[in-house]
From Swiss-Prot:
It comes from Ocimum basilicum. Expressed in leaves. Belongs to the cytochrome P450 family. This is Flavonoid-6-hydroxylase. It catalyses: genkwanin + reduced [NADPH--hemoprotein reductase] + O2 = scutellarein 7-methyl ether + oxidized [NADPH--hemoprotein reductase] + H2O; (2S)-sakuranetin + reduced [NADPH--hemoprotein reductase] + O2 = (2S)-7-methylcarthamidin + oxidized [NADPH--hemoprotein reductase] + H2O + H(+); apigenin 4',7-dimethyl ether + reduced [NADPH--hemoprotein reductase] + O2 = ladanein + oxidized [NADPH--hemoprotein reductase] + H2O + H(+); (2S)-naringenin 4',7-dimethyl ether + reduced [NADPH--hemoprotein reductase] + O2 = (2S)-carthamidin-4',7-dimethyl ether + oxidized [NADPH--hemoprotein reductase] + H2O + H(+). CDD domains: CYP82. It is found in: Membrane. The lineage of its organism: Eukaryota, Viridiplantae, Streptophyta, Embryophyta, Tracheophyta. Its main location: membrane. It is a single-pass membrane protein.
Amino acid sequence: MEFISFVYTLIAFSSLLYFYLIWSESAKPKTTTHKAPPEASGAWPVIGHLRIMSGHPSAGIPHVNLGMLADKHGPIFSIRLGVHRVVVVSSPEVIKELFTTNDVAVSSRPSVKAGKHLAYDNAMLGFASYGAYWRQLRKIVSLELLSNRRLELQSHVSMSETGQFVKELYKLWEKKKSDGSGTEVGEGVVVDMKRWLGELNMNVVMRMVAGKRFGSGDNAEETKRCRRVMGDFFYLAGFFVPADALPYLGWLDLGGHEKRMKKAAKELDEVVGEWLAEHREREFSGEGKAQDFMDVMISVVKGADLQCEFDVDTIIKATCGTLIAGGTDTTAVVFVWALSLLLNHSHVLKKAQQELDKHVGKDRRVKESDLNNLIYLQAIVKETLRLYPPGPLAGTRRFTEDCVVGGYYIPKDTWLIVNLWKLQRDPRVWSDPLEFRPERFLAGDKTFDVKGQDFELIPFGAGRRICPGLSFGLQMLHLVLASLLQAFDMSTVSDEAVDMSESAGLTNMKATPLDVVVTPRLPPRLYNEIVEIY
């Protein structure tokens, strides 16, 4: 038995060495007048820099690791992830060149196992490579699902869910006050804000996409199942499996990650498939007209020529899955960071509440029409997005042709990583870049926007692949933050600062819980006037 294991090990090592030598020869740059970007030090044989991108606790956070390499090698350098050459950039000048002059050439995605197993073989918009299918699907999503008109039609969803969120927090405070269990924190009650904000955001997105709302009532089991399935998807979608770096080892499924991806994909397909069946049955019976995004997709995709091998149901399920994944996790991440920053900077929190008291008052709830007047609150959101972009490494791209970027030659099929986390902390652009100071967007930096035109600040990306849900995300961030700050005074449980440890993954979620002491600051009638949702 030991001899057989030795033979397998010898074969595997020999295969690795053979393919590595072949790749090393093929990876040599073509003869050109431009030199290649400097390669970061610390590469291991065969696997290259894979360890610093693994997300393993002992290896550090990938975007932080790449930021330190940028300090050493400059704003454009290369790393090796197994057989793949990867260019990492973090300067606004280079990024502008990429997303203007070379935008088409960097609008495709590399082929990874997550796209194959979790994203319906890359049918999801976020995983699909640039081409006719992606362009048509992007058009449908932008014009039919996430247009300003469609968001206006769905605005009641975010308002009602935010109101329900505020009311449920108030009811929790009332309960704790009546049974005396909240006395250890004075007049307030301790709330796990990561969980509460995550559930709020999920309910908003679920109602808009599939007409579903999850709570603790009759559909508690479905709620639990959906949360688990979505949690598995978020975790695994950002996982870089060994076979992505070393394709010839794919048959080994090292670590069993592909098996987990297939299981998660099957469960996700079952959940979204059940919703689709319900919608089709409603359409067939003639009950009502299109209301949520899935209804719209059923109607629109029928007559669309998407020039792809996917069937209609797969496209609908993949697109709705994209909207749920993109809409729930990323926005919740920013909520948590914003609240954490405010708790660590109480003077900023008080200033935001003073702005709300001035423009809205305490005799009514804040409305969407008030948001344009809340300039300081908008600056808080911008500053949060600057320091903690929800996707710190954006989405990995692939060069589809040879390019010259920043004076360096980049061959076709090179991968591209844009380190937004490092870009938005550039001391050449931002004074005191590590400080949380919303006032910067009311003074010298007030012209900076987050909509992809100012390449110093692109938390939602830029170019053709900019996040299509940008407007919805900003709308939700402003509304929820305004509602929460107007309705409650907030503080930490102890005198200690909030732990700001980051985590590795597709999104940059705060690594530790966020326990917050909330105390109502409005008249009781304003909480009780909120209509229950059933």
